[in-house]
Amino acid sequence: MKLSDAVKEKRPVTCLAYCAPGVGKSTFLGLIGEKSKGKTLVLDVDRTFIPTMSKNEVVHDFDRIEVMQIDNIETWDSWTATLKMLKELHDDGELQFENICVDNLSELERCILSDLGSKGKNKGVPAQADYQYMQFKLVNSLRYLKSLGVNVYITAWETTELFQNPDGSSYSRVYPKMSAKIVDNICGLCDVVGRIIVNKEGARGLLMEATQNAYAKNQRDTRKVCKVEEFLK
């Protein structure tokens, strides 16, 4: 394919939005579903999406949103079966979703580790190999979802790490909460990584420009920040 043709081609977007609990990750996915023309599937891991939507504060149109809960005890098998089902629907030409959302990756990681640990010999504590299984599983899962030809939206909680400069000064950086060994790989596979922030008036925005203090990027367009409800514009 010629590059001149490729840059004009409309391609699905892969976006990771992260924030502290309660700031607006589920609302972000709800707005994606409400404002999209096609159907949205939310793979619910942390069980906060439905309660958030039931408040009916920001999102009001749920007609094109479907929710599938991922088992948060037998998570490895449940997640594997879900990906297999989506692939089969895609291969049969029956995948009728414009967007597939994962809410949220941080909890999915912990659930997988807890599941693997419960089946091990360390009294529920994950073994070193379990961490490696989880890391490969999550990265490969994102590649898998991207291969379905749909928009992929992932949420995560945020965490903060303190960095020290050679001169002794230090600064903190906020980034999506997941295993440090895969954060660059996961974020690298996304077109957009945005931090959900709230201003003094209570309006939610999506920060999509990297700073010294926040992990972010936008390879979809030239915006550095936008209102959450305007992300699809």
Model-derived regions, located:
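Conserved GTP-binding G-domain of TRAFAC-class P-loop NTPases and closely related GTPase folds
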Residues: 144, 160-233
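Structured loop/turn residues at beta-strand edges in well-structured enzyme cores
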Residues: 95, 148, 188
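Short, well-ordered beta-strand core segments
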Residues: 40, 152, 193-195
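Alpha-helix C-terminal capping segments
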Residues: 29-33, 145, 232
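Conserved P-loop
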Residues: 2-102, 106-107, 111
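Generic beta-sheet signal
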Residues: 43-45, 155, 196
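Hydrophobic, Leu/Ile/Phe/Ala-enriched alpha-helical segments that form helix-helix packing faces
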Residues: 86-90, 142-146, 190
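P-loop NTPase motor core
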Residues: 99-184
